[in-house]
């Protein structure tokens, strides 16, 4: 969706937010309270999706692509739709997503025992990608890193 012009999308949460989540994302509760209401963001989001996908066409869907999205982001995005009274999330998205963390496993399985973890930063470094540590956990930068990891492992696949 980043490549489709969505950019950083913020929405005011309608649930309790843990301090640890605020720290990781480097935002305050005050900043979150200043975000537009969730419904307003949902309407804009669906309008943007409809420019590219016909939700009534079973052959026209987006792939959700991310780093660790299959077990994390996909569920939150689907819950966002449900919270807005929309049970048709899969009218927009294929049920199978592209999780770059999972795809990276095959390419790093011989190095995995030497790696401290399998976080995006660690995987990127293991693949020889330069990291700007100050930008980690910034949504746009995380998208850029995910794309670089995907491109790197894709080129490795074709090299044999």
Model-derived regions: residue spans:
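Short hydrophobic "helix-edge" motifs at membrane interfaces and signal-peptide entry regions
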Residues: 16, 89-90, 131-133
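Acidic, Mg2+-coordinating catalytic module of metal-dependent nucleases/exonucleases
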Residues: 63-70, 75, 80, 111-160
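Single conserved hydrophobic/aromatic residue that forms the stacking wall/gate
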Residues: 1-10
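Conserved protein kinase catalytic domain
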Residues: 10, 104, 121-124
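Ser/Thr-centric signal marking residues that sit
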Residues: 3, 100, 146
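Short, flexible, mixed-charge acidic loops at enzyme active sites
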Residues: 14-23, 117
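Conserved DEDDh/DEDDy metal-dependent 3′-5′ exonuclease domain
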Residues: 22-107
